[in-house]
C-alpha cells in the first residue's frame, strides 16, 4: 500500500522490514531482512533459560557472562575454594587485592569494564577481613 506508493514516487528512498508482505518482495528499495523472533514465546523461554544458567554460573562458580556492569570472566570449572571480588578499577587496586590474598594461589582471573574490576581467585585459605579491608573493594564472597 502506502509504503510502495511512497517508494515509487520517491518520498521514501528505502524501506527495511523483517515482515515483508508478498507485494513488497522484490520491489526496488524494499530491504527484507530475517525476522529474529525476539518476542516469540520460544525466544522468551530461551532467554529465561539462558538468564537462569548465567545466574547459576555466577552463584556456583563466580562466572560472569553478558553482564551490563561487570566484565566477562570464565574461571576454571574445577575448584575447592574460590574468592570473588568486585572492586573499583583504579591504579594498584587489583595488585593490593592479590597481595591480601597471600600465597598459595592455584588460579587467578580478572578483568575490568566500565570502572569496575572483577577478580576470581582459587586459594585454600582466604582471609576475608584482609581482602575486604583493601581500599576499592566493593564486594567479596567466598564460594
Identify the function of each model-found stretch.
Residues 65, 69-143:
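A conserved regulatory-domain signal marking ACT and ACT-like small-molecule sensing domains
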Residues 1-77, 118-120, 125, 143:
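Rossmann-like dinucleotide-binding domain for NAD(H)/NADP(H)
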